[in-house]
Design a protein with these regions (language model features):
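Short acidic, hydrophobic short linear motifs in intrinsically disordered regions
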Residues: 22-31
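Short helix-to-turn junction characteristic of helix-turn-helix DNA-binding domains
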Residues: 16-20
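Pre-recognition alpha-helix immediately N-terminal to the DNA-recognition helix
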Residues: 10-15
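Amphipathic alpha-helical dimerization/coiled-coil segments
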Residues: 79-119
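Short beta-strand "wing" residues that participate in macromolecule-binding interfaces
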Residues: 57, 66, 105
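Basic amphipathic alpha-helical segments that dock to polyanions
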Residues: 46-50
């Protein structure tokens, strides 16, 4: 089961998904540069991810490893959105998304292929 991850936790996960196993010290450097977080803030968020089972800590050097994939989190978040905002109806989500903008021919073809693959 994939757990609910908050935006701050997703910032940590994005680093791990992009870079693979990463030392907590390096994660703190990245978040300081990109987000402006202090080292303490970063370590607090890393601890939350550890407590939730989203990452594991490896020694030496406090190396963090993602235990859930980006795809698992995306699927979980999408299911939550569909249930919360669209009464569990994925077609209502798709209709809402499609109503937001005009699709290119390439986007329409990709959607057609996706639908055909589900049939």
């Amino acid at each position: 089961m994939v757990m609910k991850l908050f935006d701050s936790e997703l910032n940590i996960m994005e680093i791990l998904w992009r870079d693979g196993d990463t030392a907590a010290k390096k994660i703190a450097e990245i978040t300081k540069e990109k987000i402006g977080w202090s080292k303490t803030t970063t370590y607090t968020i890393i601890k939350r991810c550890l407590d939730k089972g989203a990452i594991e800590r490896q020694e030496p050097n406090f190396v963090c490893r993602a235990l859930v994939t980006r795809e698992q989190v995306q699927e979980h978040e999408t299911a939550e959105l569909i249930n919360k905002m669209y009464d569990g109806a994925p077609d209502r989500l798709i209709a809402s998304l499609l109503g937001q903008k005009r699709l290119s021919a390439e986007e329409i073809n990709r959607l057609k292929r996706l639908i055909e693959s589900l049939e």
